[in-house]
Structure formats: C-alpha cells, structure tokens
C-alpha cells in the first residue's frame, strides 16, 4: 500500500499470541483511500523491499501495509509464491 495513502488511524495495534509469549503487531484497517500496488509480472530475479516500521515521525513513511491473496487469474498449475522475510534494524547518523 502506498505509504502516502496510509493514515495513522488505519493501523490497529493488536496482540500477536505465541505459545510462550505475547507480542504486538499492526493490522491495517480498510480505507477506500488506500492506493494498493500489484506486481503480477515479477521474475525470479526481482525483489521488493518493504519498510515495515520506522520510529521517526518526521513525514517520511513509517510503515508499508502489505498482504497476499489468491489470484484467480493464476493458472491451476502455477508454482506457489516464495518469500523470504528478514528483520533488519538499521542505525545511522543523520
């Protein structure tokens, strides 16, 4: 989702329950003003990098709402999507 179309009120903080602990996660509230982007023709050598969270509140994007869905136009024998998720913390001087 285009971060410029995502308001603070669109993000809902919820508990993320594990067997041994409880964490937190943001869920996205529906808003007809959201501008979603879809990349149906990606090749195996292409990637998308998402900024999932930033503590700064200076006008830069703080997060990117993202999702997956079953594409009804996919051929029945299409290979399933493969994803790699990494969580990286970057510290830098301004």
Where in the sequence are the language-model features?
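Extended boundary segments
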Residues: 1-15
């Amino acid at each position: 989702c285009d971060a410029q179309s995502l308001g603070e009120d669109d993000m809902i903080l919820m508990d993320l329950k594990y067997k041994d602990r409880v964490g937190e996660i943001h869920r996205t509230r529906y808003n007809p003003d959201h501008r979603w982007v879809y990349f149906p023709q990606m090749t195996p050598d292409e990637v998308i990098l998402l900024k999932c969270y930033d503590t700064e509140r200076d006008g830069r994007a703080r997060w990117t709402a993202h999702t997956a869905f079953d594409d009804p136009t996919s051929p029945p024998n299409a290979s399933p999507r493969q994803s790699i998720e990494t969580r990286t913390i970057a510290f830098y001087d301004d």
